[in-house]
């Protein structure tokens, strides 16, 4: 983001602007491209510079749309929990009812945690027990120190940009349906997540973990295009997947339950390979994540796996990108030669650039 801001500042300087507000409305600086098949599109009402110097501009602060952020649950309820935690120096819990109109729930609280404590924050400093239907972008961008536990369901973009926080979504105890057979969160969950954890006691919609680059997640089923463009992180899928799994996946690792040995039919194998889960590290990783899933959600399916783990682990497949696997193998090799992790990564990169060890 720093580099994006610097480049933007350079462009603004070339145009003679000091602030973004000064730029808004200056359509006289835009030029229409001459594209043959779009000649019929009339952009005159957008590009007409007649209004560029009009006294009444749409970007006048007095006319800015009021998002009523002072009325959202973060402001009215959750920030009090941060104040309490700061004063008591103890972990704090709070319960709240949510509805599907509560968009970006937890995001404002997360920003205040980051401003107040930075990286020096312990896990689960504030735990929010939410009940009901989460709105879009539930838990977006939340940092380490914040845990959101939702009993109910949630809309699209859950955990978008997750940045170290923890998200738990589980079914109510009184539910009569099987969690692993029902969708509990919407599409594009954990989009662009960089770190943190998510445990989903049910099925996710499409594009689960698209562009995930560092978060750990457990889910009991997914729709189409799961793991799309993933560059890092760990994902365990305990149920059915849709088509086109791992399209464009260049990093990270996924472990997928494949009892019918038909995952290869749904896998986009252009960049990835799949194999049995039989190495000690992989077995340990899968078990630990399923144990966490059971601990946080009480998932019946997780319990089923844990009760007969030796049998079920043989039905999982490991998905890993070809180049990512090569790099991980190189890092492991240099660590075995006595280098620490950072040094091993540097040597592995240099070796990869040269084409081998």
Model-derived features with residue positions:
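Juxtamembrane/interface motifs at transmembrane-helix termini
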Residues: 43-45
């Amino acid at each position: 983001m720093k580099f994006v801001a610097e480049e933007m500042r350079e462009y603004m300087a070339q145009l003679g602007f000091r602030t973004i507000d000064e730029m808004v409305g200056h359509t006289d600086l835009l030029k229409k491209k001459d594209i043959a098949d779009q000649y019929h599109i009339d952009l005159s009402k957008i590009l007409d510079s007649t209004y560029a110097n009009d006294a009444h501009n749409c970007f006048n602060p007095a006319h800015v749309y009021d998002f009523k952020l002072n009325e959202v649950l973060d402001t009215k309820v959750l920030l009090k929990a941060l104040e309490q935690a700061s004063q008591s120096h103890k972990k704090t819990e709070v319960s709240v009812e949510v509805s599907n109109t509560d968009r970006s729930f937890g995001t404002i609280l997360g920003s205040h945690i980051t401003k107040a404590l930075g990286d020096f924050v312990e896990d689960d400093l504030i735990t929010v027990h939410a009940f009901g239907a989460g709105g879009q972008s539930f838990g977006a961008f939340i940092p380490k120190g914040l845990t959101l536990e939702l009993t109910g369901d949630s809309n699209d973009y859950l955990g978008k940009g997750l940045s170290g926080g923890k998200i738990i979504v589980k079914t109510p105890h009184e539910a009569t349906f099987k969690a692993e057979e029902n969708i509990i969160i919407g599409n594009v969950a954990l989009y662009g997540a960089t770190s943190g954890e998510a445990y989903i006691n049910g099925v996710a919609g499409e594009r689960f973990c698209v562009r995930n680059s560092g978060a750990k997640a457990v889910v009991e089923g997914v729709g189409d295009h799961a793991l799309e463009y993933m560059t890092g992180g760990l994902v365990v899928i305990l149920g059915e997947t849709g088509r086109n799994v791992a399209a464009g996946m260049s990093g990270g690792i996924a472990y997928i339950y494949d009892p019918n040995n038909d995952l290869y039919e749904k896998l986009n194998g252009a960049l990835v390979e799949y194999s049995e889960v039989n190495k000690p590290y992989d077995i340990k990783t899968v078990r630990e994540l399923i144990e966490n899933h059971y601990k946080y959600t009480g998932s019946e399916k997780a319990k089923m796996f844990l009760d007969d783990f030796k049998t079920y682990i043989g039905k999982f497949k490991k998905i890993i990108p070809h180049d990512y696997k090569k790099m991980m193998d190189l890092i492991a090799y240099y660590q075995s030669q006595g280098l620490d992790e950072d040094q091993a990564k540097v040597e592995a990169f240099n070796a990869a650039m040269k084409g081998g060890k």
